[in-house]
Structure formats: C-alpha cells, structure tokens
Design a protein with these regions (language model features):
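Short, small/polar residue-rich loop motifs at catalytic or cofactor-binding pockets
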Residues: 24, 47, 124-126
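Short, internal strand/loop/helix patches
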Residues: 99-126
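Structural microenvironment flanking redox-active thiols in thiol-disulfide oxidoreductases
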Residues: 62-100, 115-117
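Hydrophobic alpha-helical segments, especially N-terminal targeting/anchoring helices
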Residues: 31-32, 110, 132
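N-terminal "domain-start" segment that seeds a small globular fold
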Residues: 18-41
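Short active-site neighborhood of thiol/selenol oxidoreductases, capturing the structured segment around
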Residues: 41-62, 68
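Bacterial Sec-dependent N-terminal signal peptides
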Residues: 1-24, 158
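Thiol-/selenol-based redox modules, centered on thioredoxin-like
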Residues: 125, 131-158
Length: 158
C-alpha cells in the first residue's frame, strides 16, 4: 500500500515537471504538414525561438502572419514554431496560401486534440506569441497586442 502511494506521488511529480518550467520552451509536439512529428527539441540550437499559437481561421492571426512575412528578413535569425489546434487540412491550406514552406526557419503544425501548448500558456485569445533567447529562456509573452516591430527589435538585442 505504501509502495503504491510512493509510486503515485513520484509519477505525479515527474509528470508535473513539464508544466513547472514556464520560463523555458515547453516540451511541445506537433504534426507537420508532411505527417511527421516535430518536437520542441527539434528546433535548431543556438537561435532565438518564437512560438506562435494561432488559428488559420482567425483574422487577427492572418494579419499577424502577413506582418511577419513582410519583415521575415529581420526574423531570419530566429526559429519560428507556429502551432495550431485545428486539423491538418486547415494547416496545409494555410501553408499553401501563405507560401510558408519556402521559409526554412518556420516550423508549422497541429497539436490536434492535445491542447498542450494552449494549456501550458493558459491561452485565452489568439494569436499568442512567446519569445525565447537562444538558451530557451523566456524573454517576452505577447498575448494582447502583438507587435512584429517589437519582436524584431528584441531579436536584434539577443
């Protein structure tokens, strides 16, 4: 009986560890348009990381991506992970419409059904963006007004 309690307590502690590091890049996973699993640890090392949680159907999200692509040269030094909760057909359509597959620093996919990223950040409104330095330390969370200009300035400082 004591052994079961101890084992349960250990499992709880270990499983909560993933959620207890809000100042680090979350250990997310998503499915890319090519059907492969992409994990946070697959992001290139030594570069700042931008995580964008979005919906292809969201007008504010579409506007954010247009602004991001207009200034993509300023963001080339960062890895950009774009994550949605919607099904893969929506992701593929969004990638095609915005020609996102031509950018080697943009990683896009769906966490369809898990909502891990949404829960991790307690996201209430889209789009959502988080900026991390090259060591994976949180620099800034953008959850109200998202400014690509501010993001660009902060990336230059890193």
């Amino acid at each position: 009986m004591i052994w079961r309690f101890f084992l349960s307590a250990m499992i709880l502690l270990i499983s909560s560890a993933a959620y207890s590091q809000p100042n680090k890049v979350p250990p997310f996973k998503m499915i890319n348009p090519d059907g492969k699993v992409f994990r946070a640890e697959n992001l290139p090392l030594g570069k700042p990381i931008v995580i964008i949680y979005f919906s292809p159907d969201c007008e504010d999200c579409q506007q954010l991506i247009k602004e991001l692509l207009n200034r993509i040269k300023e963001l080339n030094g960062a890895s950009i992970a774009m994550i949605t909760y919607l099904p893969m057909d929506k992701v593929k359509q969004f990638v095609t419409e915005n020609k996102l597959d031509k950018y080697s620093n943009i990683f896009i996919g769906t966490e369809e059904g898990s909502y891990f990223v949404s829960k991790y950040y307690k996201i209430g409104k889209l789009p959502f963006m988080a900026l991390y330095n090259k060591n994976g330390d949180l620099i800034k969370i953008y959850n109200k007004e998202i400014s690509i200009e501010d993001l660009s300035i902060r990336l230059k400082e890193l």
